[in-house]
Design a protein with these regions (language model features):
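Amphipathic, Lys/Arg-enriched alpha-helical "gate/interface" segment within cytosolic domains
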Residues: 1-155
């Protein structure tokens, strides 16, 4: 699977995107964002795109833009921050510069590792006095042992 998501660690909503993601896979991933939004509670998103090496075609890009706009319109007010793992230092730098020029509504950072992204997400939650579940802290410890670890279903 080249695109998927989980809210098993809510209020941390985790998304993974890889090269070759299909519209069907991306639709399922965006459904995870909708499900998180339907909870009606503040949350953060953590997206791992570290293995992406190529730009998707125009149809996929348009689909992602439309889905993102819809989710943001409906549930964006609940998102505290967004951390994105980006493999390329050049792309990471370019995205950071774009955010300096045109800041996003919510804080957004681009990191090199899942650990850095999760640490930032925890920090945002704590700053907003949103409870950080023990499963999120356990996942952080898991990442210390294995930087590529994926969360185990907590619920």
């Amino acid at each position: 699977m080249n695109a998927h998501g989980t809210d098993v660690l809510f209020p941390v909503v985790m998304l993974d995107v890889r090269d070759g993601a299909t519209i069907g896979e991306l639709r399922t991933m965006f459904d995870v964002l909708r499900t998180a939004g339907l909870r009606g509670k503040p949350h953060v998103t953590m997206t791992d795109s570290s293995t992406v090496r190529s730009m998707p075609d125009a149809t996929v890009r348009r689909f992602v833009a439309e889905q993102q706009a819809e989710v943001e319109t409906l549930y964006g007010h609940l998102v505290i921050g967004s951390a994105v793992v980006v493999g390329s230092s050049v792309v990471r730098g370019a995205l950071t510069a774009i955010n300096w020029i045109k800041p996003t509504r919510v804080p957004q950072v681009f990191t090199t590792t899942r650990m850095d992204a999760l640490v930032q997400c925890i920090s945002w939650l704590e700053q907003e006095a949103v409870a950080v579940p023990p499963e999120v802290r356990a996942y952080r410890m898991q990442l210390e042992r294995n930087p590529n670890a994926r969360p185990v279903a907590a619920r």
